[in-house]
UniProtKB/Swiss-Prot annotation:
Residues 25-62, 91-190, 272-553 are annotated as: Disordered. This is Semenogelin-2. Belongs to the semenogelin family. The gene is SEMG2. Residues 137-161, 174-190, 325-335, 385-395, 445-455, 487-498, 506-529 have a biased composition (Polar residues).
Length: 582
């Protein structure tokens, strides 16, 4: 026992002397060995570790060189060999410091031979401290894309927080951002690459779209903000539309500052819309924007903000949804654009509101809607199939503009009926509407009819205000949980709209009232009388509720009918509709 104690004490003295020598040379390096030399009297076999944690802040950020070796407490020769090994490792580390600048120069070259040179003789183990806990060698080559897209490097340095920790401080900023982008692409983990790489996942074509996107530096900042808000939605919807997007170029990626991304799924629609280029740039802008709103239909719970709709385009859109398939057709009659742009200002807006029908839980804000178009919209829903047809008769638009101002308003409000949970705010809508709407529900379904003769316009505007309020409240009936706020709506236009719901089938038909109604004031009086004839065909219950509406008791006319045969109803309604349209 005494011999063992003496042996341990002698070993401790030897180690303390060596620790003093090491402390003079390497500072705090000897503390590890001296601190670990106090324990061999407790255990026969010990594990000694000498770590070198000196950080090269001037060249390599934060990395540590670790040397680990095992020492047997009973073997003096092995202890001496391990200490000699530690001294050799320290000498190699000093050599590696001398070659750091040469190593950085090797990183700058993009040649295959020099780019991948790793001076393994100088480093035993390099540990880069990061959150992921992964070990990376500092001799990695930067990405091959270095120098191709400098603006992309700036984005990668802005959006990646972990790349800031991986930067080599001795390198320049461009090299640091390139190395950070390369590590983020190859290793993944908790890295967050720049926005264009995460959203536009196109194989082998990311560089071209990145360069194309940076050409539009004027629109880039706003589009990045929009993408940051809708990143979860855009990633799911961008993937099936990459082929069409690459064909059209960067114009389909960045359209306007306030709009989201446009996915050109309908190439034929864009071709048809380009026919209006001969009439001016305004018409083309409006038609292109209508296609962007039409392509937004699969996005549920979307927040769409439309301000300052561009002027001068007629957009007739037809949606046929058969067994979950959507077919969009656009026909643009430009023969009546010579009468002026006032007739054509808001037809786009009505079509965009029509496309919002299938968007459940949508919040649509429409402000500053321009004046003057006739929008007759037809919805036929047969066995869960939705068919939307829009026909714009512009042959009588030259007779006046007041009649054409707000027919959009009634149609757009009617189109909101199927939007459950929608919040629609419409402000500053142009003036004038008599909304004659007929809804017939058969087999336990309500039937609503509102007929307002236009002869009341010459008596005053009070009757017309009540008429519009009744139609707007009628349109709120099918809005489950919908909140619609309509402000500053005034008078004077005719819009005949008919909705039929037959055995779960929804049909909205709107005849053309424009053939002979606006030739003069007498024609308006006759149309009002014809509307009175149609009103006389209603039941006593209809007339009673219609009178209650004007008395202020009710703002909505609800009439319930049960008809046995659908063909009979269609024939009777067509006969009743003929006096109004002629």
């Amino acid at each position: 026992m005494k011999s063992i104690i003496l042996f341990v004490l002698s070993l401790l003295l030897i180690l303390e002397k060596q620790a003093a020598v090491m402390g003079q040379k390497g500072g705090s390096k000897g503390q590890l060995s001296s601190g670990s030399s106090r324990f061999p009297h407790r255990h026969r076999s010990q594990h000694y570790s000498g770590q070198k944690d000196k950080q090269h802040t001037e060249s390599k950020g934060s990395f540590s060189i670790q040397h680990t070796y095992h020492v047997d407490a009973n073997d003096h020769d092995r202890t001496r060999k391990s200490q000699q090994y530690y001294l050799n490792a320290q000498h190699k580390t000093t050599k590696s410091k001398q070659h750091l600048r040469r190593h950085q120069r090797l990183l700058n070259y993009k040649q295959k031979g020099r780019g991948r040179v790793k001076p393994k003789r100088h480093f035993h183990l390099i540990v880069i401290h990061r959150k992921g806990g992964q070990v990376h060698h500092g001799t990695q080559n930067p990405s091959q894309d270095q120098g191709n897209s400098p603006s992309g490097k700036g984005i990668s340095s802005q959006y990646s927080n972990t790349e800031e920790r991986l930067r080599v401080r001795g390198l320049s900023k461009e090299q640091a951002s390139a190395s950070g982008a390369q590590k983020g692409r190859t290793q993944g983990g908790s890295q967050t690459n720049y926005v264009l790489q995460t959203e536009e996942l196109v194989a082998n074509k990311q560089q071209r779209e990145t360069q194309n996107s940076h050409r539009n530096k004027g629109h880039y900042q706003n589009v990045v903000d929009v993408r940051x808000e809708h990143s979860s939605k855009l990633q799911t919807s961008l993937r099936p539309a990459h082929q069409h997007k690459l064909q059209h170029g960067y114009k389909d990626i960045f359209t306007t500052q306030d709009e989201l991304l446009v996915y050109n799924k309908n190439q034929h629609q864009t071709k048809n819309l380009n026919q209006d280029q001969e009439h001016g740039r305004k018409a083309h802008k409006g038609s292109y924007q209508s296609s962007s709103t039409e392509e937004r239909q699969p996005n549920h719970e979307e927040k769409s903000v439309q301000k300052g709709v561009p002027k001068g385009s007629i957009s007739i859109q037809t949606e046929e949804k058969i067994y979950g398939k959507s077919q969009n057709q656009v026909t643009i009659p430009s023969q009546d654009q010579e009468h002026g742009h006032k007739e054509n200002k808001i037809s786009y807006q009505s079509s965009s509101a029509e496309e919002r029908r299938l968007n459940s839980g949508e919040k649509g804000i429409q402000k500053g809607v321009s004046k003057g178009s006739i929008s007759i919209q037809t919805e036929e829903k047969i066995h869960g199939k939705s068919q939307n047809q829009v026909a714009i008769p512009s042959q009588d638009q030259e007779h006046g503009h007041k009649e054409n101002k707000i027919s959009y308003q009634s149609s757009s409000a009617e189109e909101r009926q199927l939007n459950s949970g929608e919040k629609g705010i419409q402000k500053g809508v142009s003036k004038g509407s008599i909304s004659i709407q007929t809804e017939e529900k058969i087999y336990g379904k309500s039937q609503n009819q509102v007929t307002i003769p236009s002869q009341d316009q010459e008596h005053g505007h009070k009757e017309n205000k009540i008429a519009y309020q009744s139609s707007s409240t009628e349109e709120r009936q099918l809005n489950y949980g919908g909140k619609s706020i309509q402000k500053d709506v005034s008078q004077s236009s005719l819009s005949f709209q008919t909705e039929k719901l037959v055995e779960g089938k929804s049909q909205i038909q709107t005849p053309n009232p424009n053939q002979g109604q606006w030739s003069g004031q007498n024609a308006k009086g006759n149309s009002g009388k014809s509307a009175d004839r149609k009103q006389d065909l209603l039941s006593h219950e209809q007339e009673g509720r219609y009178q209650q509406e004007f008395s202020g008791a009710h703002n909505t006319v609800n009439i319930e009918h049960k008809v046995a045969y659908d063909d009979l109803l269609t024939q009777q309604y067509n006969e009743d509709r003929n006096p109004i349209s002629t």
